[in-house]
């Protein structure tokens, strides 16, 4: 089994690229994930590289920015490549299968989307519509 679940903060804005040929979106970013234990009263964090593909990559790049809290679930993957100096380099990263935006907003001027989500509330909770437009249903009308 290869399954990872993380909650952390973005260390910088996600970097969005598109693959040559197919044009598939891929976003990469680093999550700062707090450790459970404090060393000498100081909170320590691990900085974990994340890669996300497709529509989730585009959404992540559009709506998330440095410092925002997000959740990621996926798998650990190790890959290698040849560097310009001729040495072989190894990279261990998380390939995200699911991302959750735990804080909204972006420095890329996406405040309109954030305002629509928040629906005008300062605390970020959504307002439910008034019940004036709801038609009452008789239990006898339900087929089960």
Curated annotation (Swiss-Prot):
Residues 112-144 are annotated as: Disordered. One of its GO terms (molecular function) is single-stranded DNA binding. Keywords: DNA-binding. Residues 112-134 have a biased composition (Polar residues). It holds the Pfam family SSB. SUPFAM superfamilies: Nucleic acid-binding proteins. GO terms for biological process: DNA replication. Residues 1-103 form the SSB domain. GO terms for cellular component: nucleoid. Homotetramer. This is Single-stranded DNA-binding protein 3.
């Amino acid at each position: 089994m290869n399954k990872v679940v993380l909650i952390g903060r973005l260390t910088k804005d996600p970097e969005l690229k598109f693959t040559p040929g197919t044009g598939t979106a891929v976003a990469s970013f680093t999550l700062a994930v707090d450790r459970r234990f404090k060393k000498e009263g100081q909170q320590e964090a691990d900085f974990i590289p994340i890669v996300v593909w497709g529509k989730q990559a585009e959404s992540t790049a559009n709506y998330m920015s440095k410092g925002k809290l997000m959740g990621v679930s996926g798998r650990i993957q190790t890959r290698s490549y040849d560097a310009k100096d001729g040495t072989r380099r190894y990279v261990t990263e998380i390939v995200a299968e699911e991302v959750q935006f735990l804080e909204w907003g972006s420095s890329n001027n996406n405040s309109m989307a954030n305002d629509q989500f928040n629906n005008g509330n300062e605390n970020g909770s959504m307002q439910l519509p008034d019940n004036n437009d709801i038609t009452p249903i008789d239990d006898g009308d339900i087929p089960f």
